[in-house]
C-alpha cells in the first residue's frame, strides 16, 4: 500500500512514525517550508521534516509554499498513491489532488465540532472535558467530509502541548486501523446542523485583561501554551500561572504575596503569577519580580 503523507507538526510526526512502523510504503512526504524561529530568526525545519532527516532520509520530501498548482498534482500522480494521508498539514488541498485517490484527514476534534485550523485550542478555550480525533475522507469543503472513524479522549486539565502529544498517539492508532480496514468501512455523513468552526490563531489572541475572568485567563494560558502565549496590555508575558481562587476583589491589583509569587485580582477571581517576562527583559520568577520592584498587596503591575 503506497502512501503520500502530508503533515507538519509533532502531531503529524506521530502518525507518520506509525505508518513506517507498520510497514506502509511512504512514497513521498509533503510538509510546510522551513521557517525562521526565535529572536535570531534561525531557519528551522518542521517537526515532520526533522523526523525524516533523522530516521528516513531516503524519503522524498516536498515543501511547497503553495500546494494549489498543477505541477504539484502532477508530481503526486507520478507516485501512484493508494491513499493520501493528511494530518495538520497547514494548507487546503485543491480538488485536483483530492481526486487522485482517497484522501484521509486525521482531524483533532470529534467532527462536526471544531472544524478548522485550531480544534485543540478551541476545545480548551470552551472548557471541553472530552474531545478526540476523527478520521475523515476529505472533500471540497472545510473538514466536512464523510467520517471513517473516531477516538474519544479526555482533555481536562491538559494544556495545548499535552493534548497535541496525546492526540498524536491516538491519531496514529486510528490511522492504521482505518487504512487496514478501509474497504470494510461504511462512511458516515456529518450532521452539518451540529457543526462549529474554529479560526486560525493570531498573536493578538494571547492578550489577557484584568477584566477577563480567572477561568478565561487560565483557559487561554492552557490553549496558547506553545504559541502565542498570554500577555498583558503592556506586553508583559505571563509564562507560568495558575488559578488561585474565585474570590471577587478589585481587579488589576496584587491581592496576595505567596511563597511562589503573587496573585492578581481579575474578574470573578484571582490568578497566581509564578513566572513572567517584561518587554525586552529576561524571564524572571514572580517572587524575584515582586522583591525587585518592592511591590506589595494593593499595588498594580501595569
Swiss-Prot record:
Describe the reaction catalysed, as an equation: L-methionyl-tRNA(fMet) + (6R)-10-formyltetrahydrofolate = N-formyl-L-methionyl-tRNA(fMet) + (6S)-5,6,7,8-tetrahydrofolate + H(+)
The main enzyme category here is transferase
Picking any one GO molecular function of the record gives: methionyl-tRNA formyltransferase activity
One Gene Ontology CC term in the entry: cytosol
Question: Matching InterPro entries, A to Z?
Answer: Fmt, Formyl_trans_C, Formyl_transf_N, Formyl_transf_N_sf, Formyl_transferase-like_C_sf, Met-tRNA-FMT_C, Met-tRNA-FMT_N
Q: Which SUPFAM superfamilies match?
A: FMT C-terminal domain-like, Formyltransferase
Binding site residues for (6S)-5,6,7,8-tetrahydrofolate: 109-112
EC number of this enzyme: 2.1.2.9
The protein's UniProt keywords, in alphabetical order, are:
Protein biosynthesis, Transferase
Its family remark reads: Belongs to the Fmt family.
Q: What does this protein do?
A: Attaches a formyl group to the free amino group of methionyl-tRNA(fMet). The formyl group appears to play a dual role in the initiator identity of N-formylmethionyl-tRNA by promoting its recognition by IF2 and preventing the misappropriation of this tRNA by the elongation apparatus.
Record's protein name = Methionyl-tRNA formyltransferase
Naturally occurring in which organism (per UniProt)? Campylobacter hominis (strain ATCC BAA-381 / DSM 21671 / CCUG 45161 / LMG 19568 / NCTC 13146 / CH001A)
Amino acid at each position: 500500500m503506497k502512501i503520500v503523507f502530508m503533515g507538519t507538526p509533532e502531531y503529524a510526526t506521530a502518525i507518520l512514525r506509525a505508518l513506517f512502523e507498520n510497514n506502509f510504503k511512504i512514497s513521498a512526504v509533503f510538509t510546510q517550508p522551513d521557517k525562521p524561529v526565535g529572536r535570531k530568526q534561525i531557519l528551522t525545519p518542521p517537526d515532520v521534516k526533522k523526523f525524516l532527516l533523522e530516521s528516513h532520509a531516503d524519503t522524498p520530501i516536498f515543501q511547497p509554499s503553495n500546494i494549489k498548482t498543477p505541477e504539484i498534482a502532477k508530481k503526486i500522480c507520478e507516485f501512484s498513491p493508494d491513499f493520501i494521508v493528511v494530518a495538520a498539514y497547514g494548507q487546503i488541498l485543491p480538488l485536483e489532488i483530492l481526486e487522485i485517490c482517497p484522501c484521509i484527514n486525521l482531524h483533532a476534534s470529534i467532527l462536526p465540532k471544531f472544524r478548522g485550523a485550531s480544534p485543540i485550542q478551541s476545545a480548551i478555550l470552551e472548557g471541553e472535558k472530552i474531545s478526540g480525533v476523527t478520521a475523515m475522507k476529505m472533500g471540497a469543503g472545510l473538514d466536512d467530509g464523510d467520517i471513517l472513524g473516531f477516538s474519544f479522549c479526555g482533555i481536562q486539565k491538559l494544556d495545548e502541548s499535552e493534548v497535541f502529544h496525546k492526540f498524536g498517539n491516538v491519531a496514529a492508532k486510528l490511522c492504521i486501523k482505518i487504512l487496514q480496514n478501509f474497504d470494510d468501512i461504511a462512511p458516515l455523513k456529518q450532521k452539518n446542523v451540529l457543526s462549529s468552526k474554529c479560526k486560525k490563531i493570531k498573536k493578538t489572541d494571547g492578550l489577557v485583561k484584568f477584566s477577563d475572568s480567572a477561568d478565561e485567563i487560565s483557559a487561554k494560558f492552557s490553549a496558547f501554551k506553545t504559541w502565542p502565549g498570554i500577555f498583558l496590555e503592556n506586553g508583559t508575558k505571563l509564562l507560568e500561572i495558575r488559578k488561585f481562587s474565585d474570590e471577587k476583589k478589585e481587579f488589576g491589583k496584587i491581592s496576595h504575596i505567596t511563597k511562589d509569587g503573587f496573585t492578581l485580582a481579575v474578574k470573578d477571581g484571582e490568578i497566581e503569577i509564578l513566572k513572567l517576562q517584561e518587554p525586552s527583559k529576561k524571564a524572571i520568577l514572580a517572587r524575584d519580580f515582586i522583591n525587585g520592584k518592592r511591590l506589595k498587596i494593593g499595588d498594580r503591575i501595569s
